[in-house]
Amino acid sequence: MSRRHRAEKREINPDPKFGDLVITKFMNAIMFDGKKSVAERIVYGALDSVEKKVKADPVDLFHRALENVAPHIEVRSRRVGGATYQVPIDVRPDRRQALAIRWLISAACGRNETTMIERLSGELMDAANNRGSAVKKREDVHRMAEANRAFSHYRW
């Protein structure tokens, strides 16, 4: 691993329909093999589906879902004197967002609906209402951190 300099962050343009940077990041995370148009169709289709079902602003619902899934604290392994401890640490804001996006997508992929649009819209609605597997994942991570609070003095 090179120690010369840290890779600079790439500039991400907001998405064309809603003008939102987070939706663009979400789209990029869904994209496979550089097929951005397919990812756009999935994300916009899911947001349109959510708008029809809930009759609310889909962007607000999307942000609420992300906020409900984002972890505030997580555990990292730390080796101290031959023993490995799970040390709870706070999550940086950019990592919080990245984890929330990743967990939402993996939870949507694990659902039983037929198309990815249906799966994603269902998971977004569930996450916005504090239900679903993505929220369960966040609660599991928080529970793990709470259980290992005794090792928080090993923080670095």
From Swiss-Prot:
Keywords from the UniProt entry: Ribonucleoprotein, Ribosomal protein, RNA-binding, rRNA-binding, tRNA-binding
Subunit structure: Part of the 30S ribosomal subunit. Contacts proteins S9 and S11.
Cellular component annotations (GO), alphabetically ordered: small ribosomal subunit
Function field: One of the primary rRNA binding proteins, it binds directly to 16S rRNA where it nucleates assembly of the head domain of the 30S subunit. Is located at the subunit interface close to the decoding center, probably blocks exit of the E-site tRNA.
Lineage, highest ranks first: Bacteria, Pseudomonadati, Pseudomonadota, Alphaproteobacteria, Hyphomicrobiales
Source species of the chain: Bartonella tribocorum (strain CIP 105476 / IBS 506)
Name by which UniProt lists this protein: Small ribosomal subunit protein uS7
PANTHER family: RIBOSOMAL PROTEIN S7 (PTHR11205)
GO biological process annotation, one example: translation
Entry similarity comment: Belongs to the universal ribosomal protein uS7 family.
Highest taxon of the lineage: Bacteria
GO molecular-function terms, A-Z: rRNA binding; structural constituent of ribosome; tRNA binding
PROSITE patterns associated with the record: RIBOSOMAL_S7
Signal peptide per UniProt: none
InterPro entries the record matches: Ribosomal_uS7, Ribosomal_uS7_bac/org-type, Ribosomal_uS7_CS, Ribosomal_uS7_dom, Ribosomal_uS7_dom_sf
